[in-house]
């Protein structure tokens, strides 16, 4: 069920992060944003400075192995960083210390920070 509000979409190069057949994948970064390209960050902190979020797509949460689960407690915690100087953002999975990376059609966690463009989308 689609909700009204603000969503985030993540892109790198010519690809957008998306849900493909119930799994995390990519789609071409062009045209209008689709529902399967929209994500919500759920803040897990207690103090305003806390940088810890669960990433949700609909009623499912992104896990540390980049699969999806309906169980929020099994969702991975991520930190979102501004890379500065217009170089985009990076999303670090906190348990592994690795960064969410879009490489062609693949989504992986890598040791080196990647550059993600983040788009705020209102439906």
Predicted regions and their residues:
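Lectin-like carbohydrate-binding module/patch detector with strong preference for beta-trefoil
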Residues: 1-123
């Amino acid at each position: 069920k689609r909700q009204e509000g603000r969503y985030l979409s993540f892109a790198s190069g010519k690809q957008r992060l998306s849900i493909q057949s119930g799994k995390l994948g990519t789609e071409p970064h062009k045209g209008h944003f689709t529902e399967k390209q929209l994500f919500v960050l759920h803040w897990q902190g207690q103090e305003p400075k806390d940088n810890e979020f669960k990433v949700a797509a609909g009623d499912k949460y992104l896990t540390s192995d980049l699969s999806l689960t309906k169980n929020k407690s099994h969702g991975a915690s991520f930190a979102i960083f501004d890379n500065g100087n217009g170089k985009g953002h990076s999303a670090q999975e906190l348990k592994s210390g690795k960064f969410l990376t879009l490489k062609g059609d693949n989504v992986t966690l890598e040791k080196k920070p990647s550059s993600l463009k983040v788009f705020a989308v209102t439906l």
